[in-house]
Amino acid sequence: MLFLSFHAGSWESWCCCCLIPADRPWDRGQHWQLEMADTRSVHETRFEAAVKVIQSLPKNGSFQPTNEMMLKFYSFYKQATEGPCKLSRPGFWDPIGRYKWDAWSSLGDMTKEEAMSAYVEEMKKIIETMPMTEKVEELLRVIGPFYEIVEDKKSGRSSDITSDLDNVLTSTPNAKTVNGKAESSDSGAESEEEEAQEEVKGAEQSDNDKKMMKKSADHKNLEVIVTNGYDKDGFVQDIQNDIHASSSLNGRSTEEVKPIEENLGQTGKSAVCIHQDINDDHVEDVAGIQHLTSDSDSEVYCDSMEQFGQEESLDSFTSNNGPFQYYLGGHSSQPVENSGFCEDVQVPPGNGNIGNMQVVAVEGKGEVKHGGEDGRNNSGAPHREKRGGESDEFSNVRRGRGHRMQYLSEGTKGRQVGSGGDGERWGSDRGSRGSLNEQIALVLMRLQEDMQNVLQRLQKLETLTALQAKSSTTTLQTTPQPTSQRPSWWPFEMSPGVLTFAIIWPFIARWLVYLYYQRRRRKLN
């Protein structure tokens, strides 16, 4: 005798009580039947819970299943409760019944257990979108956890990543900042897979960087030595004004500008030295190879894409290598000798005959500063001057605008104005304001010309479209309209002749057939 009692619940909650008489041994067939009963009870329990959830859905609730979804549930429900479809298909007057019959009959000979499990599987797909109710909670409790746990098989890969991160953290990165942007170069951390030549190059580069840093620590003053009889006080005041103006444009702060020397005895000429300490926010690359520019640093409207690559004029005064000196001497035969300087540039005298100008820059690769510029041309590359008496022209015309170094005479009190384009001038206030106004005027003129060109093109397009419209209308009017064969009072769409032919042709065909048979009879007679 076998007695089974089941309770609805999850896989762990149902219990089975077996009462087996002592005189009967345990049969394998009974054991298989018990297992089938257990599995069937689980499918039935889950199916009943899912059906209760579907039946408890409100008509105007937040979750509204689609028609296709309801057809699936209907077909699985009918297959699980009644088996395969054996009914005839409804008539054309019942389209909903026909759809239901098609969905049910498409399951074929699916067993009830398979239909129940399919019903539950479809319910699992949408159970997360349903509102949490008592029926849904019961279904979740019956189903149990149905999420799959995916094992992480990328442990080796993650260990490689962590080792790479450890190598990066333990290395000594050499950060270089140019124009307020950070540029990191990890010269101390080479991987094991790199070649020996790259390691040697990295070691040599680090040694060169250390040497240059030592040199930069020695040079902390910015000396601008001006000779050839310029007014000392006026020059100092102008330079201070220019430094404050340029630093305010760039958003940088100048901590102090003070004279550190007032007398340099050389051939009875006066000299002025300016000491300037700039914050560490602006540090140039020691090697002078890589230069980063910032489009937001420009305060002047750039008319062309050529001006976007220009550097700022104040960069030349705040290089990482330390100070630079620029001399205005009266004799070209007096060279400037200094081991820290890289190149000398001799500029031929202009109309003012101020003599030779020697510009010397302390830059990693020997960059030359012209009139307060930072040694870069229009495209951002550094100027390279030749020693063999050759010198690059200081005039570079960009789309009709002057871009040149001006040679000023001793009578005038102005100084050289650096190359424009980035909105900063190392020169007098009047010169910078004048050049800025000229650039604004040129930009406005170009804008007006462009607007006029656009307006002219629009007018041409409007006239062309108007002419095309007129020509199309005239061609339509000149083309002869097909005369309608039907009168205005005719109610039918077809013409009267067509209608008459449609009515008469059967009689004509009948008459022709009659004539044929009549002739045939005459021949027979």
From Swiss-Prot:
An acyl-CoA binds at residues 54-63, 74-78, 100, 119. GO terms for biological process: fatty acid metabolic process; pexophagy. It comes from the Eukaryota. PANTHER family: ACYL-COA-BINDING DOMAIN-CONTAINING PROTEIN 5 (PTHR23310:SF6), ACYL-COA-BINDING PROTEIN, ACBP (PTHR23310). It holds the Pfam family ACBP. GO terms for molecular function: fatty-acyl-CoA binding. Residues 158-177 have a biased composition (Polar residues). InterPro entries: ACBD5 (IPR016347), Acyl-CoA-binding_prot_CS (IPR022408), Acyl-CoA-binding_protein (IPR000582), Acyl-CoA-binding_sf (IPR035984), FERM/acyl-CoA-bd_prot_sf (IPR014352). The keyword Protein biosynthesis does not apply. Residues 157-216, 367-433 are annotated as: Disordered. Acyl-CoA binding protein which acts as the peroxisome receptor for pexophagy but is dispensable for aggrephagy and nonselective autophagy. Binds medium- and long-chain acyl-CoA esters. It is a single-pass membrane protein. The modification N6-acetyllysine is found at residue 460. This is Acyl-CoA-binding domain-containing protein 5. Residues 43-132 form the ACB domain. Keywords: Acetylation, Autophagy, Coiled coil, Lipid-binding, Membrane, Peroxisome, Phosphoprotein, Transmembrane, Transmembrane helix, Transport. Belongs to the ATG37 family. It is found in: Peroxisome membrane. Residues 181-210, 438-467 form a coiled coil. It comes from Pongo abelii. Residues 198-216, 367-376, 422-432 have a biased composition (Basic and acidic residues). The chain crosses the membrane at residues 489-509. One of its GO terms (cellular component) is peroxisomal membrane. The keyword Glycoprotein does not apply.
